[in-house]
């Protein structure tokens, strides 16, 4: 399965939670696409498989629509590691460079962060890295390259981000367009509720 490049609002409607796109459009029509209005007095019962698939899709799209093969590789690595599989899976996703760029406030969405990384706007420890899936480690310095610092896009994104939303495993130096990875993320707060245990069960079916 390739990466979905269509409207994320439609994906949000299908999953029933906002994973991207237009929040206003989702709030106005938060029922699955293809339905002409809401189904009144009747709730579609999902199979056990469909429920678990839906949780996996939520997490995939929350992190910008990661390809299925790549997402499965993350899961396999987490499953092989010692410790809580679900927690390790989230840690691997959080340590992606595009996610860190988003978490620091350089981008408004993870999709935007992926594009900005690909276009070579960021340095990691002084070297340009244009691979969105690049995995950061504690001590890594992520900074905006000099040529990009006058861009209104980055200034606007940083100004609009509430400093309190930056997780405690990251540190932002807004004046110097620089962030630092302090530690491996432990308490990970997702923007939407995701039952990671159901994702583990999905890959065990």
UniProtKB/Swiss-Prot annotation:
Positions of transmembrane segments: none
GO biological process, one term: ribosomal small subunit biogenesis
Recorded GO MF terms: rRNA binding; structural constituent of ribosome
Keywords: Ribonucleoprotein, Ribosomal protein, RNA-binding, rRNA-binding
Domain S4 RNA-binding: 95-163
GO cellular component: small ribosomal subunit
Superkingdom field: Bacteria
InterPro entries with a match to the protein in the record: Ribosomal_uS4 (IPR022801), Ribosomal_uS4_bac-type (IPR005709), Ribosomal_uS4_CS (IPR018079), Ribosomal_uS4_N (IPR001912), S4_RNA-bd (IPR002942), S4_RNA-bd_sf (IPR036986)
Subunit structure: Part of the 30S ribosomal subunit. Contacts protein S5. The interaction surface between S4 and S5 is involved in control of translational fidelity.
Function statement: One of the primary rRNA binding proteins, it binds directly to 16S rRNA where it nucleates assembly of the body of the 30S subunit.
Protein family according to the UniProt entry: Belongs to the universal ribosomal protein uS4 family.
Name of protein: Small ribosomal subunit protein uS4
Provenance organism: Persephonella marina (strain DSM 14350 / EX-H1)
């Amino acid at each position: 399965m390739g990466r979905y490049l269509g409207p994320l609002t439609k994906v949000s409607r299908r999953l029933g939670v906002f994973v991207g796109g237009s929040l206003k459009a989702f709030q106005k029509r938060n029922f699955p696409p293809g339905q002409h209005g809401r189904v009144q007095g009747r709730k579609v019962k999902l199979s056990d498989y469909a429920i678990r698939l839906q949780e996996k899709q939520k997490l995939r799209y929350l992190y910008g629509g990661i390809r299925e093969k790549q997402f499965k590789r993350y899961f396999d690595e987490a499953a092989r590691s010692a410790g809580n599989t679900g927690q390790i899976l989230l840690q691997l996703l959080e340590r992606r460079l595009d996610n860190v760029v988003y978490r620091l406030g350089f981008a408004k969405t993870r999709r935007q962060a992926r594009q900005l990384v690909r276009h070579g706007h960021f340095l990691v420890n002084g070297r340009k890295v244009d691979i969105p899936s690049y995995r950061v480690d504690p001590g890594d310095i992520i900074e905006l390259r000099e040529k990009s610092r006058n861009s209104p896009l980055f200034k606007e994104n940083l100004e609009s981000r509430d400093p309190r939303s930056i997780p405690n495993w990251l540190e932002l130096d807004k004046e110097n367009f620089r962030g630092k990875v302090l530690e491996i993320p432990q308490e990970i707060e997702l923007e939407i509720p995701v039952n990671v245990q159901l994702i583990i069960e999905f890959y065990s079916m």
